[in-house]
């Protein structure tokens, strides 16, 4: 398939129809009206701003969640923005129908209206970066900057976003660490088009610093400080935020996600195909066959999770998996990989691929130097004891079976776990070389590396 | 048993009888006569010296090998000492009966006379340390110093030597690294008696430096240089040689052997027993039962060895065992311990205790950073490939069985082996959890840690 054909076909699927556009326009009109009305009723001098991909007209067809920011004058005390902003959000939410409170740096209202998710976020009405006081304040500036600079390349952004989603490199959530929508927009603005961004995958990485708004000239000291800080933290890219020289737009982009983009961009340019944008779901396979093929073992911990949003839960699951990896490797089990996720509404899982599930019944236990008080103690207390250099060693009986080892590690608090999971993981069900049916495909994707593999 | 009783009983066994003394005296007389005669015949101005425990009267009953040194005048060229010394040795050897050439720093003759081993070693007739030119030259000075300072404490030395033999801490050979006879003599001279040396096991270690001849006052610069050098090399003791301030008599003493002495001295003083001097041979046990108890595995390599003295062979066997330890641990097998030795007249063995003999069929293979030429290569060449940070990883198929792994490591020269063993080890027979009958007890002593264990 030719590049043009592929792109044309993708565009057909991702550019919103006139019908959808009309719906969105109407929606925005209604929401703005309601917001103004409610602000007035509460006697608040608040301006409603639409931000995000909807406001920038870079949303993908069918994906039109609304971000409505409620901007307070700069001289409003922060406490008032928090409280009265939430109050206003609730009032609007009530009018729209169902709503709930969500928590980020500050609480905000998440409502649903005409089947569309509407976030109502209090913020300051900032004019430039010097006014920024809360994390969300920049959004208004981002929207403004993109709209002023995109120059009709909205569909190029849509292509890039869809491509990044297809190759699993999209999303700036802390547990994804991929490309954000804003970063995609900046790259298109800077390099001209979807294809040009892809062609520059290697170049961009080598350049390292992207400065579309020329901050390095306008505010060299501040911008250089940003560059130095981010380079020191070994970030793959430093994209100086066009609206704030103190910020790296790509601060949360991981090397892994840039790597996916790096290889997939090249492959797509070599052999364009729809598959990159819309990967056909894996048919899956037999995880037990995969275990046999590799000669490895799978242990799965299933446990209840407290009510938590993914943003909070997923990093804690990962932290716990890493904790097991470290603790088990100290115990002589090699962890070849791990995988975590939700299991149903109230449970989560940690999967660990291990080199074995049994170990010797004895372990060599290094002791102190022999000529110390502790050395003489160690000598007295151990039956089989010997020296290597000046250090004493002894044979120590240990649990041999992986389940016993894991239970003991948990009992002795020797696994670093996510802080809200400490208690619940202790009561985990531990499965060896077996997962319940709903996790079979997950286990297969994990063990076969299709999940994180670059070639799938 | 009281200390006095034990000591009395030991002395009875280790002090030579009048009969033995008479035999030794006669032997020495004869040997001296023959040596003088042969030197004269060859027109050599050589003085015969008896050195070692026989000459110092510190030999253990029944253990009366002769060290006869053939001392050349200091103005003899080294080459002449080597050649004519060997010639003289051969002449004496012929007169005595059978003999062979042995190799140390210089070749010497090892003869047998009246069922006693007689070493005939060419050296210089040195007056003090400034004259020392070859490693053996000091022996004459050692003998002289001990005889001048021992003050009739010969049996105290015998007790200490027998004790050190009993606890397996005696012998200065490079593959033993224990206490030498000369070191035992110095300790008795310095601390007064066998029991006093034992009582000071901790004190001596803490003092670190023993200077019986007062070199630190007489030659402070040279002696301090010796102390600094040996302390830097982390030797357990620095015993400045009474006849040479440049030398640490305990240079070859290992921490392990001092550790044995340290604990056994204390135990003996607490509960004196003959067992320390004459350990009753272990009855041995079942090595297979030991493997089952520990849940570990034993692999044994049997291979031919070239004709080599123990001094050369044993360090090479140890080096090879360490080589396997390192190579196998890189391959994911934990080596809990190793053991080496001769097997019959022409073979040697390396035993390795392992945590397992099978591993997964796949290994995680770390590759280069993704954005390099090598990274793109790695990506192309591997099927299952993923990123951790900026580094690529791939799944690699590996041999799973220990025999295949060892064979492959040897084929690819990935095991550091003793230099004369490289070829022969490649043809080794590899046994898993089985040893031939003559090695069964050796395997048991190794696996049960009775061999190196401090408590046996």
From Swiss-Prot, chains A, B:
Superkingdom of the source species: Archaea
Additional comment: A single active site specifically recognizes both ATP and CTP and is responsible for their addition.
Database matches in SUPFAM superfamilies: Nucleotidyltransferase (SSF81301), PAP/Archaeal CCA-adding enzyme, C-terminal domain (SSF55003), PAP/OAS1 substrate-binding domain (SSF81631)
UniProt source species: Thermococcus kodakarensis (strain ATCC BAA-918 / JCM 12380 / KOD1) (Pyrococcus kodakaraensis (strain KOD1))
Top enzyme class: transferase
Lineage: Archaea, Methanobacteriati, Methanobacteriota, Thermococci, Thermococcales
Binding site for Mg(2+): 65, 67, 119
Record's protein name: CCA-adding enzyme
Stretch forming the signal peptide: none
GO-annotated biological processes: RNA repair; tRNA 3'-terminal CCA addition
Annotated GO MF terms: ATP binding; CCA tRNA nucleotidyltransferase activity; magnesium ion binding; tRNA binding
Record's keyword terms, sorted: ATP-binding, Magnesium, Metal-binding, Nucleotide-binding, Nucleotidyltransferase, RNA repair, RNA-binding, Transferase, tRNA processing
Binding site for ATP: 53, 56, 142, 161, 170
Disulfide bonds: none
Job description of the protein: Catalyzes the addition and repair of the essential 3'-terminal CCA sequence in tRNAs without using a nucleic acid template. Adds these three nucleotides in the order of C, C, and A to the tRNA nucleotide-73, using CTP and ATP as substrates and producing inorganic pyrophosphate. tRNA 3'-terminal CCA addition is required both for tRNA processing and repair. Also involved in tRNA surveillance by mediating tandem CCA addition to generate a CCACCA at the 3' terminus of unstable tRNAs. While stable tRNAs receive only 3'-terminal CCA, unstable tRNAs are marked with CCACCA and rapidly degraded.
